[in-house]
C-alpha cells in the first residue's frame, strides 16, 4: 500500500496542489491516510472507507483515480469476500478509464474479487464483461494479463459461462492465447478451457476459431499452457460433430497428443490420454492412434503408480480395443499382463471395469486372442474376483465370460477352470444383465462339448436355473433357458438327456407359461451377449415357439 500512501501524502504536503483539489477530495485523502495507518482494523468495503475511495474514483484528477484503483487492488488482494454492488460499482467505473495504470489496477481488483462465487455472478450481472473485453484488447500487456485473468475467474462460475460465450469474449481470448507474454497466454488458454464444459459453449468456441490455436499450442514448452489446451481439446472431443471436424481439419492432432503422453508433467500426460480416449470413440481415430505409435506409451501408463494416469490409460485402450483390426496389435504390444494386474484395483471400480471391458473386446473375434487371454491368467483372476465385486464389475466380467464361452476350442478349458462354480451363483443375481450373461455363458458351455462330466456334476443347479428362467416372463431369459435345454437334449450324454426329459414331462421344468411376444420392455437385459456374441435381445416370440416345438419333438 506504500504507493497509495506516498501518493496521498504528496497531496497533503505539496502546496502547489491544494487549489487543484476539491474540498471533498482533500477530506477523502485525509480520511484514507488515517484508515491506511490502521488498515488491520478497517473494513474498506463499508461506510467511511468506501465513501472516501469512491470520492477519488469520481474525481477528474487522474492521479486520484490511480490511487483509488491501486488501493482497491491491494485491499482486495488481502480481503476477498462477498461484496455488494456499492463496492463493485466504483471499480467498474475505474474500468472505463482510458489510463493504462487505472485499467491495470482496476482489472486486478476485479480479478481478486472474482475468486468468490457470489462476486463472480454479481460482476457479470452488473455489466462487467463489456469493459473487461475492451481491456483485453488493450495494447498494454499488464492490462491484458489482468483483464484475461479476471475473465478466467468469472468463467469458472456455471451461471456466467453461457453469458461469456455469447459476449464476444471468445475471439479476443483466442487471439491472446497466441500472446508472446506467457502470463497472458496462460490466462487466455485457462479461460478458453473454462468455456468447454457445455455443448453450447463448446460450439461457440469452435465457431470463434479457437480449435486450431489450441492444437497449435500443444507444442508449447509451458506445461500449464499444454495442460489447458489438452484438457480443452479433450472436452471438445466429447461431441461427435467436433470429432468429425477435428478429423478433417487437424491432421497432426493425434501425433501431438501421443507425444504428450510422454510428457514430464503427469497432469499433461493424463489429459492427453483422456483426449485420445474421447477421440477414440470413433473408429477412424481408434486406428490412427495405433498407427501414430500410441500403444507403447499406453502400456507404460498402465504400469504407472499414479492412479489418474492408470485410469486415463485403461479408458483409452478400452476404446481403441473396440476396433477388430487393433486386437492382435494390442496383445502383441504386451497389454495382457498389465490389464490382468489392473483387476486387483479393488479401490477403483472404474479401472476394473475398463480393464475387463478391454479384455472382453480383445476376445471378440479371434481364437488366438481368446487363447492368449486364457493363458494370461485373466479368466482365473476374474473367477476369483467376480462374486465379491460390485454389480458394474460383475456385469463386465459376466459379459466377458459369455464371449469366451462362444469359442468351441476353449469350452473344455473353461469348464476345467471351474468357471461353472461362479456362473451358477451369478444366474441368481438381481441384476438382469449379470444373470443373463452368466446364463448365456452356461448355455454356450453346454453346447457341442466332447465331455459332459462337469455339466452332469452340476446338473441339479443348472436345471434350477433353466426352470427359473422359463418362469421369468422375460423373453430373453426364456430364450436362453430353451436354448440351453435344447443343447443338453442334443448332447450325447444319455444321463443328462434322461434327467431333462423326466423333469419336463413331470412339469418340474415347465414349458407351459412362456411368452410368445417381446412387447414387454426389459431394459436391464438389453446388453446380454446373444448367441452371435453381440449385445442385444436374443430373439422374438417366434423363436421361443420354434425352440419349444423342437424340445417337445425331442422328448416324445
UniProtKB/Swiss-Prot annotation:
Record-annotated disulphide pairs: none
Cellular component, GO annotation: fungal-type vacuole membrane
Top-level taxon: Eukaryota
Topological relation to the membrane, as annotated: Lipid-anchor
Lipid attachment, kind N-myristoyl glycine: 2
Localisation: Vacuole membrane
Protein's GO biological process: autophagosome assembly; nucleus-vacuole junction assembly
InterPro entries (UniProt xref): ARM-like, ARM-type_fold, Armadillo, Vac8
Keyword Transmembrane helix carried by entry: no
A molecular function GO annotation: protein-membrane adaptor activity
Main location: membrane
Lipidation (S-palmitoyl cysteine): 4-5, 7
Annotated keywords: Lipoprotein, Membrane, Myristate, Palmitate, Repeat, Vacuole
ARM repeat extents: 38-74, 75-115, 117-156, 158-197, 199-238, 242-281, 283-322, 324-364, 408-447
Family membership noted in the UniProt record: Belongs to the beta-catenin family.
Known role: Functions in both vacuole inheritance and protein targeting from the cytoplasm to vacuole.
PANTHER family: VACUOLAR PROTEIN 8
Protein name stated in the entry: Vacuolar protein 8
Originating gene: VAC8
Amino acid at each position: 500500500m506504500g504507493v497509495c500512501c506516498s501518493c496521498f501524502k504528496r497531496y497533503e504536503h505539496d502546496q502547489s496542489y491544494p487549489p487543484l483539489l476539491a474540498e471533498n477530495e482533500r477530506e477523502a485523502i485525509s480520511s484514507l491516510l488515517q484508515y491506511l495507518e490502521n488498515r488491520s482494523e478497517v473494513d474498506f468495503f463499508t461506510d467511511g472507507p468506501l465513501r472516501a475511495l469512491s470520492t477519488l474514483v469520481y474525481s477528474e484528477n487522474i492521479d486520484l483515480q490511480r490511487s483509488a484503483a491501486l488501493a482497491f487492488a491491494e485491499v482486495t488482494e488481502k480481503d476477498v469476500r462477498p461484496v455488494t454492488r456499492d463496492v463493485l460499482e466504483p471499480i467498474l467505473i475505474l474500468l472505463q478509464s482510458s489510463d493504462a495504470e487505472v485499467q491495470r489496477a482496476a482489472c486486478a481488483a476485479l480479478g481478486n474479487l472474482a475468486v468468490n462465487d457470489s462476486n463472480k455472478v454479481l460482476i457479470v450481472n452488473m455489466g462487467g464483461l463489456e469493459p473487461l473485453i475492451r481491456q483485453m484488447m488493450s495494447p498494454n500487456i499488464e492490462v491484458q494479463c489482468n483483464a484475461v485473468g479476471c475473465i478466467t475467474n468469472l468463467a469458472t462460475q456455471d451461471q456466467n459461462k453461457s453469458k461469456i460465450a455469447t459476449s464476444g469474449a471468445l475471439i479476443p481470448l483466442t487471439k491472446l492465447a497466441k500472446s508472446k507474454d506467457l502470463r497472458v497466454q496462460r490466462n487466455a488458454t485457462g479461460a478458453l478451457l473454462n468455456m468447454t464444459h457445455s455443448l453450447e459453449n463448446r460450439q461457440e468456441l469452435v465457431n470463434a476459431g479457437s480449435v486450431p490455436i489450441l492444437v497449435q499450442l500443444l507444442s508449447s514448452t509451458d506445461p500449464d499452457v499444454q495442460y489447458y489446451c489438452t484438457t480443452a481439446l479433450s472436452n471438445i472431443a466429447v461431441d461427435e460433430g467436433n470429432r468429425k471436424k477435428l478429423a478433417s481439419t487437424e491432421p497432426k492432432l493425434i501425433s501431438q497428443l501421443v507425444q504428450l503422453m510422454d510428457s514430464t508433467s503427469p497432469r499433461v500426460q493424463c489429459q492427453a490420454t483422456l483426449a485420445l480416449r474421447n477421440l477414440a470413440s470413433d473408429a477412424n481415430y481408434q486406428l490412427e492412434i495405433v498407427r501414430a505409435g500410441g500403444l507403447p506409451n499406453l502400456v507404460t501408463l498402465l504400469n504407472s503408480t499414479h492412479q489418474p494416469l492408470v485410469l486415463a490409460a485403461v479408458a483409452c485402450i478400452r476404446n481403441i480395443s473396440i476396433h477388430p483390426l487393433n486386437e492382435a496389435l494390442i496383445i502383441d504390444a504386451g497389454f495382457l499382463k498389465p490389464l490382468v494386474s489392473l483387476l486387483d484395483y479393488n479401490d477403483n471400480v472404474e479401472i476394473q471395469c475398463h480393464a475387463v471391458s478391454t479384455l472382453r473386446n480383445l476376445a471378440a473375434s479371434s481364437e488366438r486372442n481368446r487363447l492368449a487371454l486364457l493363458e494370461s491368467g485373466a479368466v482365473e483372476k476374474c473367477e476369483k474376483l467376480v462374486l465379491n465385486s460390485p454389480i458394474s464389475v460383475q456385469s463386465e466380467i459376466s459379459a466377458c465370460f459369455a464371449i469366451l464361452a462362444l469359442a468351441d476350442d476353449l469350452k473344455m478349458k473353461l469348464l476345467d477352470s471351474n468357471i461353472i462354480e461362479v456362473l451358477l451363483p451369478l444366474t441368481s443375481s438381481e441384476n438382469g444383465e449379470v444373470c443373463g450373461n452368466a446364463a448365456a455363458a452356461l448355455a454356450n458351455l453346454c453346447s457341442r462339448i466332447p465331455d459332459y462330466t462337469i455339466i452332469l456334476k452340476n446338473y441339479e443347479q443348472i436345471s434350477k436355473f433353466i426352470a427359473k428362467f422359463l418362469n421369468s416372463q422375460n423373453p430373453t431369459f426364456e430364450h436362453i433357458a430353451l436354448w440351453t435345454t435344447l443343447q443338453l437334449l442334443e448332447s450325447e450324454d444319455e444321463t443328462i438327456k434322461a434327467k431333462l426329459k423326466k423333469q419336463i414331462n413331470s412339469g418340474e421344468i415347465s414349458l407351459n407359461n412362456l411368452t410368445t411376444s417381446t412387447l414387454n420392455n426389459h431394459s436391464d437385459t438389453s446388453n446380454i451377449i446373444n448367441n452371435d456374441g453381440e449385445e442385444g435381445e436374443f430373439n422374438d416370440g417366434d423363436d421361443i415357439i420354434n425352440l419349444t416345438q423342437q424340445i417337445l419333438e425331442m422328448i416324445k
